[in-house]
């Protein structure tokens, strides 16, 4: 690591610690030439996740967009905000764990529906009606019947 004082290219690590969030490592280094100490940080490089929309367009994953969609489905339902945030956190974590650079919006939609079904059936049906693009009452009825059969 290049010393910021004398620009020598060699240094030694004298102390390493995780940051509070455990997202990076703080290292204290000592220059082998001038003896000055300096701090560096090491972290994993984030790979932006691209969402492939139904029409083939690609856009960056937007956590707030996911949160807004779920909140609309849960509107006027007895679901605490913390629970909704937890659902979004879980989905975001699962997406990151997949280690993919691209993911289909349909896959994200299925993840949301899977979680909403366990939390609140009304919120689930609301989300499904938009996500699955119900065109008429019969599609809505079919989804309700499918939900009732699973119980």
Curated annotation (Swiss-Prot):
ZnF bounds (unnamed): 3-34
Function of the molecule? Negatively regulates transcription of bacterial ribonucleotide reductase nrd genes and operons by binding to NrdR-boxes.
Cofactors: Zn(2+)
UniProt keyword annotation of DNA-binding present: yes
Example of a GO MF term: zinc ion binding
Q: Which GO terms describe its biological process?
A: negative regulation of DNA-templated transcription
What is the name listed in the Swiss-Prot or TrEMBL entry for this protein?
Answer: Transcriptional repressor NrdR
């Amino acid at each position: 690591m290049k010393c910021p004082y004398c620009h020598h290219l060699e240094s030694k690590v004298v102390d390493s610690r995780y940051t509070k969030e455990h997202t990076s490592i703080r290292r204290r280094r000592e220059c082998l030439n001038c003896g000055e100490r300096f701090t560096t940080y090491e972290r994993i490089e984030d790979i932006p996740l691209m969402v492939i929309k139904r029409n083939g367009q690609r856009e960056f994953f937007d956590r707030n967009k996911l949160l807004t969609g779920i909140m609309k489905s849960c509107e006027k339902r007895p679901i605490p905000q913390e629970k909704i945030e937890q659902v979004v956190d879980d989905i975001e974590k699962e997406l990151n764990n997949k280690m993919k650079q691209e993911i289909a919006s349909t896959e994200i939609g299925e993840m949301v529906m899977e979680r909403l079904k366990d939390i609140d059936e009304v919120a689930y049906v609301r989300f499904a009606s938009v996500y699955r693009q119900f065109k008429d009452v019969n599609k809505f009825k079919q989804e309700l019947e499918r939900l009732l059969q699973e119980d």
